[in-house]
Curated annotation (Swiss-Prot):
Organism: Corynebacterium glutamicum (strain ATCC 13032 / DSM 20300 / JCM 1318 / BCRC 11384 / CCUG 27702 / LMG 3730 / NBRC 12168 / NCIMB 10025 / NRRL B-2784 / 534)
Encoding gene (name): ctaE
Protein name per the record: Cytochrome c oxidase subunit 3
Cellular compartment(s): Cell membrane
One of the GO BP terms on file: aerobic electron transport chain
Recorded family membership: Belongs to the cytochrome c oxidase subunit 3 family.
Residues passing through the membrane, by range: 29-49, 72-92, 104-124, 142-162, 184-204
CC annotations in GO: plasma membrane
MF terms (GO), sorted A to Z: cytochrome-c oxidase activity
Pfam families hit by this protein: COX3 (PF00510)
Length: 205
């Protein structure tokens, strides 16, 4: 009797500990996004230091005249819209709606790809105006910050593709739903970073 009570008494704390134990996927995602946040914080710092130096020698303002703000706003709206469609996909995954998940993630992939292509077109236009990564301090700051962000967008698009391929090849499982949510966290993060870059580069200048 005592043994049974003792075992029950030991089992209860173990169950509580199991319930309170952090999900390793969540912890890993938080750690990864924290590292990414520090990386982009460094890029923002680099941009503002370059901006201060450029303003000091008078070479910064004339470079920003090449920016097409309405065009940048358009591709920004496209990227932000992809965050909305991504979240719709997550809602579908939580309901076990595989068709909805596929549909919304596919739309997200298309919108993300349009953003990358749009940014590539902007690069071509700016290079045509003589603005390159080697042409000036501003050119270096612009292409480095936006270029690294574009690489993160491409990585996000590829992650969506991987999720869809895994869903297509096997039965939909809770693990796949979790993977979809983790990818969405990364995508929302990339979108928020771009909003910060857009405000900094195209409005504050």
């Amino acid at each position: 009797m005592t043994s049974a009570v003792g075992n029950t008494g030991m089992a209860a704390p173990q169950r509580v500990a199991a319930l309170n134990r952090p999900n390793m996927v969540s912890v890993g995602t938080i750690v990864f996004l924290s590292q990414e946040l520090m990386f982009f914080a460094g890029l923002f710092a680099m941009y503002f230091v370059s901006r201060a130096n450029g303003l000091a020698n008078g070479s910064w303002g004339e470079q920003t005249d090449h920016l097409n703000v309405p065009y940048a706003l358009l591709i920004t709206v496209i990227l932000v819209s992809s965050s909305v469609t991504c979240q719709f996909g997550v809602f579908a995954a939580e309901r076990g709606d595989v068709y909805g998940l596929r549909k919304w993630f596919l739309v997200t992939i298309i919108l993300g790809s349009i953003f990358v292509i749009g940014q590539g077109y902007e690069y071509i236009t700016l290079v045509g105006h003589g603005l390159t990564i080697q042409s000036s301090v501003y050119g270096s700051a612009f292409f480095i910050t936006t270029g690294f962000h574009a690489l993160h967008v491409i990585a996000g698009v590829m992650a969506f593709v991987v999720v869809l391929m895994r869903i297509h090849k096997s039965k939909f499982t809770p693990a796949q739903a979790t993977a979809a949510m983790v990818v969405s966290y990364y995508w929302h993060f990339v979108d928020v970073v771009w909003i910060g870059l857009f405000i900094t580069i195209y409005f504050i200048q």
